[in-house]
Structure formats: C-alpha cells, structure tokens
C-alpha cells in the first residue's frame, strides 16, 4: 500500500481526485483515488509502490488547484490499540528517509477538530519515539523531509513523508489570516492570502509597493480595494454599488460607477487589476486575459466562481479561454497560478502576468 495523500477543503474531494488522476497520468504514474465525501482527504493509490516517492518529488503542489498539502504515504494504521498507538506507527515509518520534522495532523473539519487536542498530546511521545529509532533527527532540520502522521480518527493514522521543496509549510496546509476590523468585508482575506501565496516574499516590496496604480472590478463595498489601499496604492474602484466611506476618505480611491466589463482606465499606468465579480467564469477569464494580453495592466488576481458540479472541468475551460486569448493577441508567454484558497468558497483564485 503506497501512494499520495492530499488535503483539500471538505466537499471538494471529487474535484481534487479528478485533478490528481489527470496530473499523475501526465507523469506516467497510474493508480486510483480513494476518498470519502466531506473528509477533506484524497488518497491516490499507486499501482507501483515506488511511484509514491516519485510523485512526492515531481508533482508540484503549487500546480495543484484543489490540494492544500501532499505527502507520500506508506501505510494506513487501522484499529490502533489505545494502549500502544505509537508502535504500529513506528513500523510504518521504518523505510522513510531521515526526517527533520514531525507533523501530526487531522482534517480541517468538525470531526477533525474534535481530535486536535489528541493530536497535540500524542505528538510529544511520538516525536521522542521517532528520534529513538533515528527516523527523526535530534533537532528539527528544515532541509530534510517532513514525517507526516495524519489521524483520520483516534485509532486510524496515515503515515508518510514529504519533501521541503514540495510541501506547504503551514499547519494542515492552511495560511490563516486575521480579519482586519477596519476592512469592509471578509472577502479582503482572499486577496491578502493570494498576494502572500502568489508573490514571493522577496518580491513583494516591489510588486506590491505604495504608489502603484490599480483597478478593482466589482469593488463594492471594498474588501479587495482595502488590501490595495493598505499597501499604499491608488485604486479605481469600479462598481455600481456603494463603497465603504472610510476607504473613500483615504483619498486613494476613485469611485467609478460603471459596468466592469465595459470600464476603460483613464490612463495607461495600471499595474494591478483585481476582480471578484459574481459572473460566469468564462466571461471573467476572457476579460482578465484581454487586459493582460493588451497590456492594460501588468499583473492580475481574480476569482472564478464555480458551478456546483464539474468544478475542475469548469476551471480547465476557463484556463483554455485564457490561453486562446493570449495566443490570439500574440502576447507571448505568460505565468499563471490557480489555487483554491483557504478563504475561497465555491471559487478559485487566479494570478496572471506576462512572462517578461
């Protein structure tokens, strides 16, 4: 038994499973997905056991839309004796590469949170036992693989490992952010998470600097505009609804009560285009790609609202529209990242810019 374990938002297991099967086939790795609805977990069982390690190294987490975390698993330890849960877990880790960190985790769900205290409690003796067997280094080392023990419940654990170059450094693969009280809506967290995920830290000072000009399509009441203003940008907020008064009082926002699909910026100095309009994903994708292809902006972050069924297929259709639009305008190569963020719901967030 060997394969890839992947975390996702509860309810999106089928979408992640479809995506993983397709991506694995592109790497000539074959198997089948195993999932339970609303578990937040997908197990891709490899037909060839050695392929699990290959996937952990070569299937980039950053390219998976619906996955929050991934690791190669070797065993599912079931019906663990409450008097000795650690023994079977150790046996499942014997052939792991030397690991520099242990993560004991659970699902991001009501059931998962019920065992979070148990996971914290067992972490200390489990870490000591792994170090005693030299599976884990005496001190944490971030350059070595991570040992994962994922508890489905208090008597069932999946054991595996991931590589530091291809995993999420966040607990459960979740970047948790604090809602700023002065922000006009919770949607502000989506753009904040997108900026932190898509823009490397060493480049944020330049690409998210004060003084840049931005356009926010579908801006009201101003959740996304808030993130731009907070960073010192000047924003054209496009929407027929009402904007937050505090944002308007900053002097950094020009309100444009117009249709986002028809809006044209006054000047050719827009760096960022952001968009969280509730519209068909195909329409939004074409609009965003047109702005990028015609160089009306340099970078864009936008959301694609998804249908209840065939969400992965809907995303692929939208991305194909983007590719066709860029090709039609002969705009050249471009960088594209897509992720189902923690703060997203029935939507995914896209970052895009020309590769100059």
From Swiss-Prot:
Gene Ontology biological process: methylation; rRNA processing
Residues annotated for S-adenosyl-L-methionine binding in this entry: 187, 220-223, 239, 259, 276
GO cellular component terms given for this protein: cytoplasm
Catalysis: reaction(s): cytidine(2498) in 23S rRNA + S-adenosyl-L-methionine = 2'-O-methylcytidine(2498) in 23S rRNA + S-adenosyl-L-homocysteine + H(+)
Gene3D superfamilies according to UniProt: 3.30.2300.20, 3.30.70.2810, Vaccinia Virus protein VP39 (3.40.50.150)
Keyword rRNA-binding: no
Subcellular location: Cytoplasm
InterPro entries noted in UniProt: RlmM_FDX, RlmM_THUMP-like, RNA_MeTrfase_FtsJ_dom, rRNA_MeTrfase_M, SAM-dependent_MTases_sf
Any one GO MF annotation of this record: S-adenosylmethionine-dependent methyltransferase activity
Alphabetic keyword roster: Cytoplasm, Methyltransferase, rRNA processing, S-adenosyl-L-methionine, Transferase
Main location: cytoplasm
Active-site residues, record numbering mapped to chain: 305 (proton acceptor)
Assembly description: Monomer.
Family assignment from sequence similarity: Belongs to the class I-like SAM-binding methyltransferase superfamily. RNA methyltransferase RlmE family. RlmM subfamily.
Classification via HAMAP family: 23SrRNA_methyltr_M
NCBIfam families (alphabetical): PRK11760.1 (NF008734)
Protein name: Ribosomal RNA large subunit methyltransferase M
Protein species of origin: Pseudoalteromonas atlantica (strain T6c / ATCC BAA-1087)
